[in-house]
Curated annotation (Swiss-Prot):
Keywords: Cell membrane, Chromosome, Cytoplasm, DNA recombination, Meiosis, Membrane, Nucleus. GO terms for cellular component: chromosome; cytoplasm; nucleus; plasma membrane. Disruption phenotype: Complete sterility of male and female gametophytes due to altered meiosis. Striking reduction in the number of meiotic crossovers. InterPro entries: SHOC1-like. Interacts (via C-terminus) with PTD. Interacts with ZIP4. GO terms for biological process: reciprocal meiotic recombination; resolution of meiotic recombination intermediates. The keyword Iron does not apply. Residues 532-586, 1566-1662 are annotated as: Disordered. It is found in: Chromosome; Nucleus; Cytoplasm; Cell membrane. Essential for normal crossover (CO) formation during meiosis. Essential component for the formation of class I meiotic COs. Interacts with PTD, another meiotic component, to regulate CO formation, possibly by stabilizing the recombination intermediates during meiosis. SHOC1 and PTD may form transient heterotrimeric or heterotetrameric complexes with HEI10 and/or ZIP4 to promote class I COs formation. Does not seem to be involved in early meiotic recombination steps involving double-strand break (DSB) formation, processing, and single-strand invasion. Highly expressed in anthers and pistil during meiosis. Expressed in pollen mother cells (PMCs) during meiosis. Expressed at low levels in roots, shoots, leaves, flowers, and glumes. Coiled coil: none annotated. This is Protein SHORTAGE IN CHIASMATA 1 homolog.
């Protein structure tokens, strides 16, 4: 690989021939020059010293004759090396110079790692070789005696010449005894001076153990001759270098400053030494500071590229094609400030400076470089391979491109060493990381490597199989596990095998081992129906596995005694083993003897005993057991015990309560005087109650003040809430602590924290994230296993557990009834309940299970009528039914559950103690006696004690309401059971007569309660409900047909009833009012202090008032669908334009409200209440312009109601009445709305269809916001169904999320797009098709009267012509569904923006109309609340006040129905299909319990206000039930149109009412009249077949004339201005004939012709000429505007009547 120079030094003789060459030189004949003597030098190479030779000189004054001797002297001085003397050890500060002596002193192109610079003196300077030593004191004299001045003189005259780096045969040099040199001269490296003057070579070593790699710089020239330097380890203590190997010690002894290239691999490790000594550290910094500012860099006269003159190619690109380009950084000395901040680091004796994990080198002159060192510390693993394998793998490697013959590797190691030396030679251009890892590569030979599979196979083959046991033959066939899911046939076959196995006889020892026998179960059959054969054999089962009574020592002893003294059983004769054999028997039971080991396939193998989870009890039923246990008869029942441990959540809450309890004990001064911590924790609640009341304190009551009693109350409350939380779950605990905090005037902080924690957990439980109590999961498993075989179930539990238990039963769709809640079954004597059996038998026909109180078990209860009994003991570890076993006959199989509180870290003392409910009466009496203050204080005291003793139970009605709301929300389309019918609750608004803090006991003790409190018992007709703060979702599923059976007194205190809520104590409010604090160009209601203070006062009644800055111009948000806007005269005066008439400005403002404000409000609300306040002239002008408001509201599909007021006081009354009526109607559960706006609310309210109330409905729908956005449209509607949120809001929200903003569909108001952005939109169709459809849409006229009448009839051909109502046709125009959804709610129509459904479907609900309570037509509470001035103005405006279905009352005996504030009514233009809208005026003036508001999909709100359900299965058989109308009905215009737009689903009332009969007759008359007019109005001019076949109807926004002032009521009415409506076109032959079989008195029938179509009037009204409209209200766009606006246009203007709204235009099919 050598290309230019050989590494052989011909002038350096070897040790063997040194003497011979010395003699050879003696025979050289040099003229006039003696041969110098060359004695061997023991310290270095044996050459003659150059100082002994005469120096050659050259004259400076011209060239003279040169003798030959002078030339030979110069030649010899130039080519013959000479020995140099050994210098002395340098000073300590020379360490820096020796370590970095070769950096920065050889020119600008030389880096800090450059080696091999040669300095050749001139001929006149002699043959001296100058050392780099800088000792100016003259230490270490030279062998020739030269002075330091001459040496420095020659040094300055040196000339730098650059040659090839000379290789030296180090083996010869290492064999000699080399003296040691100074420890810090060469910086840890080894230097060697050759004969060549001033040439120094560094000996560096590559440490294989630590993988010290050669560092290659980025530039190509430097990479040719640079070799990384590895310094030798240096220690501080001994003052000299310490190396590991002897050869390295010899090399380190060379103290000549020469640098030797790296030629061989050594195994020296590079390790980090300890820190420098104080002396060395001080010397380093002193040298740095002195030389830092004086540093200078010497530059070379030659460029480094001179070494590459022999090559013409770029070796960097030759080795690596994609070599990175690095900029060469100029080495500059660092500033002294930066150097002082650095840390001194010593690595193997080398001193470096560290800053920010970077090492900076020190230069020889003491300066510090600003370029960090490239030192790589890396550990690699070196694996020694045999030489033959190494090179064999190297040759066979695919990456090896070298063709090396086998002759090179004939020797063992030498050839490999030569190859490696050639690879690491400095002549190789290592410019990148190609050769960075120099250790021998590990190349695996895939052919030679042995596979791991054969050894594993050999090991497996060598294993011996386990010997077969005798039990292998009884294993079942396990192939069913390999077939995937088991089918029913296979499992039934194995069930038969199990049945056959039951006939085996067990030994007496197995039967006697009570505590250690596993239960015989077959878990792999638990998911399948039990076979009839198995069920039949269960009734005659002869297998009895007796066990002691659970955890009761007395019962256990009695059972054992009975076993020893009892006679033989009928089915077998058992021997009684000794106790020793019984105790040792469990240890002898193996897996082979356990049948569960073989049969339990699906639930994994269970072995040993399992008496903690399930035990079997065989309890006698003979009456003689109470007297004597000598004999007992066979009992045919199996008892299983299921211990339940508290969940982690409950344990965490109890630990929190325990921590609060402990801290209260430590902070209480009273307890420090009375009890220790342990005594305070173990004190019973009865003792705490005595200390609170002051009775039985025995002297400790003397220093118990009011503050101490409050601490006692907190301690008692903590113990009680922990008790309910542990044994009855989150619901009971939440009810208890909520009731207690409302009873206290100042709630302690400890109770607030506990209340907040339990409330958070309870809300999560309502979302079904986890169970409120862990026993509910076990109960569900037991009930589902028995529900499949259709068995009646009896559940015995404490009343406090009925609430979560009822929720679980309701979620399982199981009906149940609570025993003892019916007044007919309430008796004082619990034993003599003679009618309990009959009542149970009657209820079992309608219910799946019965709930029974474990404290109230009658002796005559028919237990044998149930297939299974489930008893929840809670804190009781023994069964209550088993204690009554002698009195119970035929007890069916029993499942007993109890809570197991045994645990090391569980505070059992905090939850186990509980006072008896029987002591409640005596405690209340003692409270009144111990308190000696005034009556008010005694009452407060009694309330506190009552709250402390509050039992969190529920009643039947609460369960019924919550179950219904959740059931309809979860599955609105599921058909209810026939027995699941609601019942009318007629007196729900009556006030309860209980004291707000009285405690209600069990209904069997109501007479005692009445005696104590001297207060009447609640009437059975009035069923109090639990307040909403209980936060229960679904409880009871039982349904009773008799209203008397569904109403009873309850054991709840009346403090939790709706009518007796304490002010400001409602944790979850029933009503939320949102007040707008924004500024929208008008005076906001919040700015009027008097009005806003009255709204804030509503919080005392349980309402919540929340302030929000809303972008909409509304003042109040009463619900998710209704808002209230208030205007005063000042607004209109400020905004009045400069006109001559004052009213013109008011009209313009009213039109602005109609076109802009109503438009923006219509996206978020379906109902709006406007209150105008001002003087009479102002109100008159607003009334005259109110037609535009009604027309705009009807066009926008909104319900609008106007109120007018003179004074602020009357305005406040109107607003408060509106709040009361709206909130009383909206009885859906409300979400928890915080006081401050959240980020999610801000995001949702940015959508135009979402307001703050509906935003939190979406957020409380059961998932996070991200999950809600990922749900489909149907899932979203179903999720918010329980809140009765309008599906229109969700549909618009989905449309905005789906389509975004596209093209001309962008709205300038909402910055969102409409449904026209869809790809199927008509706007995206071709102009020709769009124009054709537009002409078709405008060409079909409409008949308003025809459609108004059609609302009162169900077409009989819906099923035959279902294709008429295709989705594409339903979406054409805004008012298309006026003909469809306003049909009776017997039919419901699903309609949304998502048109994936095909066709038009309707569904008939199967409910009874009797379930809906009767309507009270007029309620004067709201109307009488208005001032007389308001009534006068309302009478003046008549039907202009409301677009709702205004109150109407038919004639009864000729009397005029004028009790309402509004005397007339007009048709409402709102659509009342399945979307919930704001109640009509008819409903708002009706009884709150009878309001009719659409409530979600396929239901209305009728009856939901007080727990009733929607039942709209009214059968409208028009042809059979309708009769001819009376003529007098048609005389009054108001009566003719009173029910024209009413929601039929809301009028399914009791049969036989007078107004209903008149109503049905009127509908029949309208139906027949419409049929006649339909035949007369058919236009024969419409001859296009496609148009004639089309059954689509197009509705324009209602005309303004329908809202005009009617004038005097007695004036004969006749409509003079026909309006454009919708007309039916028929195909019959009589289509062109005018048939007027029943002409109405107030309607003129005009004959039709082919040339002109006669438009019938909307209704028989008469409009004064001065009040008739000369313009029409339509939607238009101006210029480039993309948002249409509602403006008045002339009737003759083009396009009037065809300006349909953009969002309802026809989309392409």
């Amino acid at each position: 690989m050598r290309t230019r120079f050989l590494a052989t030094d011909y002038f350096a003789p070897s040790s063997s021939s040194a003497a011979g060459k010395a003699l050879a030189l003696e025979f050289f004949s040099f003229p006039s020059l003696p041969v110098p003597a060359l004695p061997p030098d023991p310290h270095f190479l044996p050459f003659t010293s150059a100082d002994e030779l005469p120096a050659a000189t050259v004259a400076d004054d011209g060239l003279g004759p040169l003798p030959i001797a002078s030339a030979l002297s110069d030649f010899l001085a130039a080519v013959i090396p000479q020995a140099l003397p050994v210098p002395t050890v340098p000073a300590a500060d020379e360490v820096l110079d020796d370590f970095l002596y070769d950096r920065g002193g050889y020119g600008e192109d030389f880096s800090s790692w450059e080696f091999g610079a040669f300095r050749i003196p001139k001929a006149s300077e002699g043959y001296g070789v100058i050392n780099r030593e800088k000792d100016e004191k003259g230490e270490g004299s030279r062998s020739d005696g030269l002075e330091i001045s001459s040496v420095m003189k020659r040094w300055e005259q040196l000339k730098e010449l650059r040659f090839e780096v000379v290789e030296v045969d180090l083996l010869m040099a290492l064999q000699e005894d080399i003296a040691s040199f100074g420890e810090e001269e060469s910086g840890g490296g080894v230097t060697l001076l050759l004969r060549v003057p001033d040439m120094k070579i560094h000996l560096d070593f590559i440490d294989i153990e630590t993988d010290i790699k050669i560092r290659y710089q980025s530039d190509l020239p430097e990479s040719v001759y640079q070799v990384e330097k590895v310094p030798v380890k240096d220690n501080d203590g001994n003052g000299h270098s310490s190396l590991r190997e002897d050869c390295c010690l010899e090399i380190a002894a060379l103290d000549h400053g020469a640098v030797i290239p790296r030629l061989e691999v050594s195994r020296n490790s590079w390790e980090l030494d300890d820190c420098l000594t104080e002396t060395d550290r001080y010397g380093v910094f002193d040298n740095v500071v002195r030389h830092l500012d004086e540093a200078q860099i010497q530059h070379s006269v030659f460029k480094s590229t001179e070494f590459l003159r022999s090559t013409d190619m770029d070796m960097l690109t030759f080795v690596c094609e994609d070599a990175p380009c690095h900029d060469i950084q100029v080495d500059k000395p660092a500033e002294i400030k930066a150097a002082v901040e650095m840390d001194v680091v010593r690595i193997n004796g080398n001193i470096l400076l560290e800053k920010n994990s970077a090492l900076y080198p020190l230069k020889p002159d003491g300066t510090c470089s600003d370029l960090p060192c490239s030192i790589l510390l890396e550990e690699v693993q070196i694996i020694d391979f045999p030489s033959d394998n190494v090179f064999k793998m190297l040759v066979q490697s695919e990456t090896n491109k070298m063709n090396i013959s086998d002759e090179i590797f004939k020797d063992d190691f030498d050839p490999a060493r030569r190859l490696y030396e050639s690879m690491v030679s400095c002549e190789l251009a290592l410019v990148d990381d190609t050769f960075r890892s120099l250790p021998t590569p590990i190349l695996n030979d895939d052919i030679a490597v042995r596979s791991r599979v054969p050894p594993i196979q050999e090991i497996l083959c060598s294993l011996k199989p386990h010997p077969l046991s005798a039990s292998d033959g009884i294993y079942l066939d396990w192939h069913l596990l390999l077939e995937g899911p088991c089918n029913r046939e296979i499992c039934c076959s194995y069930a038969s095998m199990v049945e056959e196995a039951k006939t085996c006889h067990l030994s007496s020892e197995l039967q006697r081992s009570c505590q250690s026998t596993s239960v015989f179960v077959s878990d792999f059959l638990e998911d399948f129906q039990r076979s009839p054969k198995l069920q039949d054999e269960d009734k005659h089962s002869d297998i009895y596995v007796p066990a002691p009574l659970s955890h009761d020592p007395q019962k256990l002893e009695a059972t054992q005694k009975c076993e020893q003294e009892g006679g033989t059983r009928n089915h077998s004769s058992m021997k009684r083993p000794s106790p020793e054999k019984s105790s040792s028997f469990p240890e002898l039971i193996s897996h082979s003897g356990d049948l569960n080991f073989y049969l339990n396939v699906r639930s994994a193998t269970k072995s040993g005993t399992n008496n903690e989870n399930t035990s079997t009890l065989d309890v006698p039923h003979s009456e003689e057991q109470a007297l004597s246990l000598s004999t007992r008869a066979k009992v045919d029942k199996l008892i299983e015990i299921h211990p339940v441990s508290p969940s982690n959540l409950i344990q965490g809450l109890i630990e929190q309560i325990h921590a609060s309890y402990t801290s209260a004990l430590q902070e209480s001064t009273y307890w420090r005087h009375s009890f220790s911590d342990e005594q305070g924790l173990g004190i019973s609640k009865q003792k705490l109650l005595e200390l609170i009341t002051g009775e039985g304190s025995e002297g400790s009551y003397n220093h118990c003040e009011h503050k101490d009693k409050m601490e006692l109350i907190v301690l008692y409350a903590l113990k009680q809430v922990a008790y309910y939380l542990c044994f009855f779950g989150l619901h009971a605990a939440h009810l208890y602590i909520s009731n207690l905090t409302r009873s206290l005037e100042n709630t302690p902080e400890r109770l607030k924290h506990i209340l907040w924690s339990i409330s958070e957990a309870q809300r999560k439980s309502e979302r079904q994230l986890f169970e409120s109590h862990p026993s509910l999961s076990c109960i569900e498993t037991i009930l589902r296993s028995n529900k499949q075989i259709d068995q009646k179930i009896l559940i015995v539990a404490d009343r406090a557990f009925w609430l979560p238990l009822g929720q679980k039963l309701a979620s399982m769709r199981m009906t149940f009834v609570e025993f003892g809640q019916n007044p007919a079954t309430t008796f004082v004597d619990l034993v003599n309940k003679t009618n309990s059996t009959a009542w149970v038998l009657e209820e079992l026909l309608k219910s799946d299970c019965i709930l029974l109180d474990n404290k109230n078990i009658p002796a005559s209860f028919p237990f044998d009528k149930f297939g299974i009994i489930l008893e929840y003991g809670g804190p009781n570890k023994s069964s209550t039914l088993l204690s009554l076993a002698p009195k119970l006959d035929g007890l069916p199989p029993l499942h007993f559950l109890y809570v197991k509180v045994d645990g090391k870290d569980f505070p059992a003392a905090l939850v186990e103690d509980n006072h008896k409910d029987q002591d409640l009466k005596s405690t209340l009496d003692k409270v009144l006696l111990t308190l000696q203050k005034d009556l008010q204080e005694r009452m407060n005291k009694m309330r506190i004690v009552d709250s402390l003793n509050f039992i969190p139970a529920t009643n039947q009605l609460q369960g019924l309401q919550e179950k219904r709301s959740k059931h309809f929300a979860a599955d609105a389309t599921k058909e209810l059971l026939p027995d699941d019918q609601p019942h009318r609750l007629q007196n729900l608004n009556k006030k309860n007569t209980f004291d707000s803090h009285n405690v209600v006991l069990a209904d069997e003790q109501l007479h005692i309660q009445q005696t104590l409190s001297n207060k009447p018992v609640v009437n059975s007709q009035c069923v109090p409900t639990v307040e909403k703060s209980s936060s229960t979702s679904s409880v009871s599923a039982n349904v009773l047909k008799d209203p008397q059976e569904n109403q009873s007194t309850t054991d709840l205190p009346s403090c939790v009833k709706n009518d007796c809520i304490m002010p400001g104590r409602l944790s979850v409010p029933d009503v939320v009012i949102v007040v707008n604090t924004g500024n929208h160009g008008k005076t906001m209601l919040v700015s009027r202090r008097s009005s806003y203070q009255q709204i804030l006062a509503l919080e005392k009644g349980g309402m919540q008032v929340v302030e929000r800055d809303i972008d909409l111009p509304v003042d109040l948000i009463l619900s998710a669908a209704v808002c209230l806007v208030w205007y005063e005269t000042a607004l209109f005066e400020a905004n009045e334009l400069t006109t001559s008439a004052e009213t013109s400005g008011i009209k313009e403002n009213v039109e602005n409200i109609a076109t802009n404000i109503l438009m923006s409000v219509s996206f978020s609300f379906t109902g709006c209440i406007m209150v105008f306040e001002g003087e009479a002239d102002f109100l008159s002008a607003v009334m005259d312009s109110s037609d535009s408001l009604y027309t705009a509201a009807a066009s926008l599909d909104m319900n609008l109601q106007l109120f007018f007021s003179h004074t602020p006081r009357s305005t406040d009354e109107i607003i408060l009445n509106c709040i009361t009526n709206v909130t009383s109607c909206y009885k859906a559960p409300l979400p928890d709305i915080p006081e401050s706006e959240s980020l999610a609310e801000s995001f949702l309210t940015s959508f135009p269809s979402i307001n703050p109330v509906s935003a939190y409905m979406l957020l409380s729908s059961g998932g996070s916001l991200v999950e809600f956005l990922s749900w489909p449209h149907e899932r979203r509607i179903q999720a918010v169904g329980k809140y009765l949120l309008s599906p229109k809001i969700i549909s618009l929200f989905n449309a905005l999320c789906k389509f975004g903003e596209l093209g001309e569909s962008r709205s300038v108001m909402t910055e969102c797009s409409s449904v026209d952005s869809d790809i199927s939109s008509a706007f995206l169709q071709s102009p020709r098709k769009r124009k054709q459809r537009s002409l078709q849409a405008c060409a079909v006229p409409t008949n308003k009267l025809l459609f108004s009448d059609s609302l009162n009839q169900i077409p009989g051909d819906y099923a035959e012509h279902a294709e008429v109502f295709s989705p594409s046709k339903l979406r054409k125009f805004s008012d298309m569904d006026n003909t469809i959804p306003e049909l009776p709610d017997v039919f419901t129509f699903d309609e949304s923006l998502n048109m994936r459904s095909e066709g038009f479907s309707y569904q008939q609900k199967k409910h009874d109309v009797d379930a809906i309570p009767g309507n009270q037509v007029i309620n004067d509470d709201f109307s009488n609340g208005l001032t007389p001035n308001n009534q006068a103005y309302n009478r003046r405006t008549g039907n202009m006040v409301d677009t709702f279905d205004l109150p109407w009352q038919p004639e009864f005996g000729g009397t005029h129905p004028s009790k309402s504030t509004f005397h007339t009514s007009r048709p409402s233009c709102s659509r009342t299909h399945s979307n919930p809208v704001f109640s009509t005026a008819f409903e708002i003036n009706d009884d709150p319990g009878e309001w009719n508001i659409s409530g979600g999909t396929k239901q209305t709100w009728k009856g939901l206000a007080h727990g009733g359900t929607v039942d709209d299965s009214y059968r409208y058989d028009m042809d059979n039930r309708y009769h001819e109308p009376r003529d007098e009905i048609m005389q009054h215009p108001a009566s003719s149109l009173a029910f024209q737009k009413l929601d039929f689903g809301s009028h399914a009332t009791s049969q036989g009412s007078c107004w209903e009969i008149d109503y049905l007759r009127q509908m029949s008359a309208k139906r027949k009249a419409r049929q006649e007019r339909s035949r007369c109005s058919n236009s024969p001019g419409m001859s296009i077949p496609r148009m004639r076949d089309s059954n689509s109807k197009i509705l324009n926004p209602p005309p303004k004339e329908s809202f005009r002032y009617r004038g005097d009521r007695d004036t004969p009415s006749r409509d003079q201005s026909p309006s454009i409506g919708t007309q039916h076109y028929g195909k019959g032959k009589e289509g062109a004939k005018a048939q007027n079989r029943r002409a109405r008195k107030d309607f003129n029938v005009q004959p039709t012709s082919h040339k002109k179509r006669i438009e019938p009037s909307i209704d028989p009204t008469w409009t004064p000429i001065d009040k008739r409209a000369r313009q029409k209200l339509s939607f238009v766009t101006y210029g480039k505007e993309k948002q249409s606006k509602l403006v008045w246009r002339n009737q003759n203007s083009p396009g009037v009547g065809c300006g349909f709204r953009k969002r309802f235009r026809e989309e392409g099919t």
